[in-house]
């Protein structure tokens, strides 16, 4: 017989025997009860551990009232994903996005810009989102005289303070000292801004706008760096907003969150006078690392922008503010369009530029495009889809990332002062840090050797190098300026250089002194660098004294003399500030005086000793 079959039959007989035994002694019902109870307990335990599904309620509401308790109607309120407007009683309601970090409003033109504190006058127009909070109320303070008809806007490109102490050659004898970037921004840029504000007529409304890259975590992460720069930016009398830059994020959620913790939302708007300012984060990172240039916007940002502009009166001027230029860049997103400009080969316009311009064309007051990022000054003008487009690309307050006092285009560290009257941009000038506001250019001799660099070689002027060719670097110039050389009482239009390339003086200077930034960044090796504010003139008489006259579109004329031409490879205007030079001379003279007095004392004591 099969062994397996025998085993099976034996098992069946045992099972039958056990069952009969249990039935005989009435044990079977007890066994069934135990099994049933055990199963019930297991099921019950399973039910207990399953958490109930809680549906979050993202519906929020609130009100905007003035200090007297009156509702403020028609104000845009947003969560960064959608926009709504307050009703006639100042109330609003919306379903916020689950990813929203802030609820905020677009500051109306008739009201003050709220700030973080009396001593930190950076804008605070938002509340952080809490899952437990359903009501977000805001109180607005009316401007004493209502909406401003005229005001100044100070625009600061790239403060870009780092956690490093960059060597800074501050004295004529090449003795480097180390100052923190925050200290330099505070004691130089902000100190000069305070003087500019002080020089304005009493009662002039002044606002500020940082174009992003407030910080860069070069030299290591510093959890306090964003707060330090916010306090510096907010230390003057102007109320200031900030755009977020690529280095404020560098593709890291921690960095971006730190910026948001200090400045609030990255996509927002506000009104001043008859202008509607829209600030938006156009730093689009590829897989969290490299960023696209020109700047780009995500689809959800375009939806937000369309809603914001749809709720904005069409008689206003729109000033679109962002960090990376939209009209040029050489690290493009796949759908970006080649510019097709021979002198700017390799540059592209943003894939969003057509859509943005279509949105901006709705506004009767026109529009302006404001950006930063480049560390060179450039009013970039292109012919785009049948339209003349200008983008104001602002030079950096930090210049070549605090390695000197100049940007890589030779423009001094500084900031811009705009004036708006109604919907008109009526004035704009560049204010070099610690420079006189009327000094708007520097003059060079084309053949001068700046540490191996020269304008004659860079721009193909070598054939006339014996004629003392003059080069004028006119910091804020564009095609609407008129730049002439006056020789023997006669005016001659200067030739404008507009192409990719370098500024010979800045390249040569930084080649020697820039320790933390590569030479490629400031030289011809930087294919991103566009130079369009250099002008040259070939004198009729190489020995003539020549006056350069630059006239801007706002009615201002600035002059410089050929005798002012920089002829030294490391001219001190980039080396140190005059204020610091005076301090240096004072200290040096004091040391010399003390040394002379000590020598005289030693001589007197020696003579007395000899007599004895």
Tell me the role of every PLM-derived stretch.
Residues 75, 81-94, 496-502:
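Short, acidic Ser/Thr/Gly-rich low-complexity loop/linker segments typical of extracellular
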Residues 109-116, 123-132, 219-313, 336-368, ...:
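Extended active-site neighborhood of metal-dependent phosphoesterases/phosphodiesterases
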Residues 56-57, 63, 68, 74-85:
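Short amphipathic beta-strand segments in non-cytosolic proteins
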Residues 60-66, 90, 138:
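A short, amphipathic beta-strand motif
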Residues 502-537:
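Aromatic sugar-binding surface patches on proteins
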Residues 388-477, 481-488, 529-562, 591-592:
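Binuclear metal-dependent phosphoesterase catalytic core
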Residues 30-59, 97, 112-222:
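N-terminal active-site segment of His-dependent metallophosphoesterases
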Residues 93-102:
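Short Pro-Gly-centered beta-turn/loop motif in secreted/extracellular proteins
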């Amino acid at each position: 017989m099969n062994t397996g079959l025998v085993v099976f039959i034996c098992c069946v007989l045992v099972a039958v025997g056990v069952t009969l035994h249990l039935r005989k002694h009435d044990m079977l019902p007890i066994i069934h009860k135990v099994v049933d109870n055990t199963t019930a307990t297991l099921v019950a335990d399973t039910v207990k551990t399953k958490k109930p599904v809680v549906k979050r309620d993202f519906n929020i509401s609130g009100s905007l009232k003035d200090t007297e308790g009156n509702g403020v109607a028609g104000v845009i309120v947003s969560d960064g994903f959608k926009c709504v407007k307050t009703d006639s009683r100042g109330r609003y309601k919306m379903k916020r996005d689950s990813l929203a970090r802030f609820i905020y409003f677009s500051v109306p033109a008739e009201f003050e810009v709220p700030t973080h504190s009396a001593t930190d006058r950076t804008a605070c127009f938002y509340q952080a989102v809490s899952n437990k909070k359903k009501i977000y109320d805001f109180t607005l303070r009316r401007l004493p005289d209502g909406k401003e008809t005229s005001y100044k806007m100070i625009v600061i490109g790239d403060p870009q303070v780092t956690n490093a102490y960059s060597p800074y050659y501050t004295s004529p004898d090449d003795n480097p000292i180390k100052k923190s970037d925050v200290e330099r921004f505070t004691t130089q840029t902000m100190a000069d801004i305070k003087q500019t504000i002080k020089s304005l007529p009493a009662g002039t409304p002044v606002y500020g706008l940082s174009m992003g890259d407030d910080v860069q975590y070069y030299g290591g992460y510093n959890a306090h760096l964003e707060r330090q720069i916010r306090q510096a930016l907010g230390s003057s009398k102007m109320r200031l907003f900030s755009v977020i830059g690529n280095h404020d994020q560098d593709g890291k959620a921690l960095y971006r969150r730190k910026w948001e913790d200090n400045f609030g939302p990255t996509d927002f708007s506000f009104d001043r006078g008859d202008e509607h300012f829209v600030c938006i984060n156009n730093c689009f990172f590829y897989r969290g690392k490299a960023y696209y240039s020109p700047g780009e916007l995500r689809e959800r940002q375009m939806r937000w922008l369309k809603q914001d502009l749809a709720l904005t009166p069409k008689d206003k001027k729109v000033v679109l503010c962002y960090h990376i230029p939209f009209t040029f860049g050489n690290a493009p997103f796949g759908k970006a369009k080649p510019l097709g400009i021979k002198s700017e080969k390799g540059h592209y316009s943003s894939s969003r530029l057509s859509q943005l311009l279509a949105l901006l064309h709705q506004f009767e007051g026109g529009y302006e495009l404001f950006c930063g990022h480049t560390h060179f000054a450039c009013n970039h003008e292109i012919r785009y889809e049948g339209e003349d487009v200008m983008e104001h690309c602002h030079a950096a307050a930090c210049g070549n990332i605090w390695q000197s006092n100049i940007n890589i285009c030779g423009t001094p560290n500084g900031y811009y002062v705009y004036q708006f009257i109604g919907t008109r941009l009526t004035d704009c000038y560049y204010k070099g840090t610690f420079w006189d506001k009327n000094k708007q250019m520097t003059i060079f001799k084309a053949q001068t050797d700046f540490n191996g660099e020269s304008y004659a070689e860079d721009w193909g002027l070598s054939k006339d190098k014996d004629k003392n060719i003059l080069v004028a670097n006119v910091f804020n110039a564009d095609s609407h300026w008129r730049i002439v050389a006056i020789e023997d009482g006669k005016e001659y239009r200067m030739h404008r250089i507009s192409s990719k390339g370098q500024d010979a003086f800045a390249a040569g200077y930084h080649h020697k002194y820039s320790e933390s930034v590569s030479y490629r960044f400031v030289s011809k090796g930087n294919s991103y660098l566009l130079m369009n504010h250099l002008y040259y003139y070939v004198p009729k008489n190489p020995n003539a004294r020549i006056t350069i006259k630059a006239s801007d579109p706002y009615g201002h004329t600035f002059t410089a003399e050929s005798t002012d031409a920089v002829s030294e490879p490391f001219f001190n205007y980039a080396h140190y500030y005059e204020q610091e030079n005076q301090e240096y001379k004072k200290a040096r003279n004091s040391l010399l005086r003390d040394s002379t007095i000590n020598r005289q004392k030693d001589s007197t004591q020696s003579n007395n000793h000899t007599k004895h």
